[in-house]
Structure formats: structure tokens, C-alpha cells
Amino acid sequence: MKKFVFSVCALFAAATISFAQDVNEATDYFNAAVEYLNLGDKATALENFQKAYDIAKECGEAGQALVDQCESTIPQLALMVAKDYVKAGDYETAVAKAKEAAAIAAAMNADASVAEAEALIPNIYMQQGNTLLKAKDYAGAIKAYAENVAINPSNGKAYVNMAACYDKLGQTDKAEENYLLAAANGQEKAANKALGNIYLKKALAANKAKNFDQAIELANKSISFNETSKAHYIIGLAAQNSNKLDIAITAFEKYLELDPTASNAQDVRTVVDALKKAKK
């Protein structure tokens, strides 16, 4: 019986010594993490804080103070690491680190940090898209914007930019589709202006190809999104060339109303007068 009691005491003593050693090891990792953080090496600091945390959690009450300190530090530090990758332009790694930060924060019940990390992810995709758009990598930008709206489907600005990329690639159907989504999500003014320009270009091309009825139709479509003097002028030209005098007169007069100081204003007035005389 005495031997058994002795053995149990020895076991508790060994456990106490083990816990003390583990807490010391956790403390060493924690202190190393602080040093790395002071040196600006956030990634290595995070690794050491995580090691300190994992060890301290196994030490029960003896490691609780370290656990608390780690839990108040690690979630925000993980976010800072992700943001550093954003600043460096390494967007793929930034997204991976932001997802990792969200998972870490969730495991530590740091709800505010979870929300911040999750909100960061679509912003990273948006910034990536903007960077690629500026670099004229339109296909890459479309991919990034698509990732953004998959998470945040009400981001009208992403649809505007994605539509602009499709337009640059000559995919006007896709451009129109995304401009309409942009208009439905708070970007109506920018989207309608862009849609007006798309149909204005189509109307110009149709008029140049002597497809006058199509030119009139497309110019009217342009006006339905964004009224411009140029669209009315194209209608006037196409209608004049297809002997639709009433339409031509109305369109040219609207052109002069919208742009009375146009360089060709006097010539257009002369044409209008001639068309009116031709009707008599």
C-alpha cells in the first residue's frame, strides 16, 4: 500500500515538473515571438505565438495566462500577415492567409476578427482586379472581379469594371450583361453611360456599313441608356440616307438643341432647311 501511494506521489511530481517545463517552453516561444514582432517579422512572430499557444493549452491552469495573451494577439496578427501580402501585391497568398486568419480567429472565438478576415477576402479580389485592369490584363481582371462578386454579389463597382474588361476584349454581350448588373446594384449612372457608348459604337459601324435601319435602331438604343448629341446625329445621317426625312429632321434638330455650338452646327442647319424644303 505504501509503495502504491509513493508511486502516485511520484507520478504527480513528474507531471508537475513536466507542466513547469512545458510552460517554460511556451514562454520561450512567446518571448521569441515578441522579439520577431519587434523586428517587423510578423510571419515568424505568428508561428512562434502559435507554438506557445499550442503548448500552453496543454498545461492547464499553469499555462492559462499565456493562452489568454496568445488569444488576444494571434487573430489580429494573422490578419496583419494577410494584409502585408496584399501590400506586396501577392494576392493569391493574401487570400489564403486571410482564410487562414478567419479559421484561427474562429477557433479562438474571436468573432470580430473572423468578421474582419472574411470581409478582407472580397476586398483583396477587388484590389487584384483593379491592379490587373490597370495593367490591361483584362482576362485576369475579370477572373478576380468574378471572385469578388461571388462573395459580394451587390458590388456594383465590380460589375462596372468587369463589364469594361469584357468591352475591351470585344465581348460586348458579356459587357452589356455586367453593366445591367451594375445598374441594378447602385451604379446606374456609370453603367448607363457605358451602355450608351457601346450602342453608339455599334450604330456608327452600322451607318458606315450603310445598314441605315440598323444604325437608327442602335442609336435609339444608345439614347435609351444615355442621350447624347452624337447618337441623334447618327440617326439624322442614317435617316437622311434612307430617305426618312421626318426622322432625319427631328434627329438633326435634337442634335442642334443638345450641342448648339458644335463645329458643324451651321452645316447641319443648312441640311435641315434643305430637308424641310424637300418635303414640300
Predicted regions, residues:
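Short coil turns that delineate tetratricopeptide repeat
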Residues: 23, 57, 106, 153, ...
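Helix-start (N-cap) detector for alpha-helical repeat units in TPR-like alpha-solenoids
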Residues: 26, 60, 68, 75, ...
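Register position in tetratricopeptide repeats
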Residues: 38, 76, 80, 87, ...
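Canonical positions in the second alpha-helix
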Residues: 52, 101, 148, 181-182, ...
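Canonical tetratricopeptide repeat
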Residues: 65-69, 73, 80, 120, ...
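Alpha-helical adaptor scaffolds
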Residues: 122, 184-224
